[in-house]
Amino acid sequence: MLFPLIHRWMIQVWSCSELQAAGVTAVFGIALFLPGAFNNYLVDTFSRKNVCTRSIMLLALVGILYPYVSSVEMVVLLRILQGALFGIVLMATGSTLAIDVTPSNNRNAANRVFTWSSIVGMLSGIIIGIEGGNYLSFDTLLYFSAFLCAVAIVLVSMVTVCFRAPLDLPLCSFDRFILFRTLLPGINMMTVPMVLGMLFIMISNAFFYLCIGSGFLIYLLVRQVFTRPMNGRIQIFIGQLFTGAGLMLLCNADTGEYLYGAGLLVGIGVGFSIGQFLRMMILLPLHCERGTGYHTYQLLWETGVMLGIWISQYVRQAGNNNPYQVALGICVIGFLLYQVYIHRYFTKHYQTN
């Protein structure tokens, strides 16, 4: 939700160029990694619910400070603070609390549900950020964002988590931060959110994102009907084929039926592609590495979105290429990398679990 708001605000209030505004917005993705080395210490030394709720509260408080800053540098600082806090929230929710409250035989499903919910939430936020700016002031939308954070705090507070005695852990480690075993599939996965991030910059039509959401729901319905696991190569082929088809439509025209048809195709493609990439990211971790593996996925997903935002704006400003064509190229690279190397990597390392 904050991306379209802050991007537009940077241009209108601070007279930033499109590329500068994209850079200020995308620094959020780098900041996600700042607290990572302390993640395991935080959630195994302090109450996990408290770590989560207090991080969300600080995230909300930082968010309402934007109207009071006096320089672009202070805006960058707020983006860094929000990125770091959001990184802690991601770790405390998706890779910690969601697993803690789920029986071991249902944890794969819990990871999937959390992922699907986060994608729907991201698309909903983009729509609110685009449409809300037409009816409400910047300050009002920031307070609405803080209100949503308050709702999240209430919901997390209602979760019952078993008591865990504090552990004597080192201050810094890679636990609950980055799992190198899943890093290569994760880098391959980043091509999917990078394409989405590029579209976030290029298209400000809320109905387009509703079409993406509809396509994603179509994938979920297909997945419920055909419950048997699909071959990974075939699933990635289908996903990237739909995404590529949507991008080709946008290369021809990004208005009217072309735009909405492309959104539907991209939504279906994202669903199929992420379905397989997520499967790898939750099956490759060894015993007691699930939280770290899933957090690696979360970090790389968010980083991919922010990287796509910056790449799209850079390509637009350079003026040498059509950003949709660049996005199509990224889609093809992701497909080829999976088919040539990552599928064999997954098969080999999964069999050695």
Regions found by a protein language model. Name each.
Residues G23-Y41, G213-V222:
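Central cavity-lining transmembrane alpha-helices of secondary-active solute carriers
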Residues N231-F277:
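C-terminal transmembrane helical hairpin of 12-TM major facilitator-type secondary transporters
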Residues M57-S71, L241-D254:
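C-terminal ends and interior cores of transmembrane alpha-helices
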Residues L78-S117:
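Cytoplasmic helix-loop-helix junction between adjacent transmembrane helices
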Residues D139-M158, P323-R344:
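Symmetry-related core transmembrane helices of the 12-TM Major Facilitator Superfamily/SLC fold
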Residues L34-S70:
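Conserved MFS/SLC helix-loop-helix module at the cytosolic interface between two early adjacent transmembrane helices
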Residues M280, L284-N321, A327:
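A late C-terminal transmembrane helix in Major Facilitator Superfamily
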Residues S104-S157:
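Helix-loop-helix hairpin linking two adjacent transmembrane segments in secondary transporters
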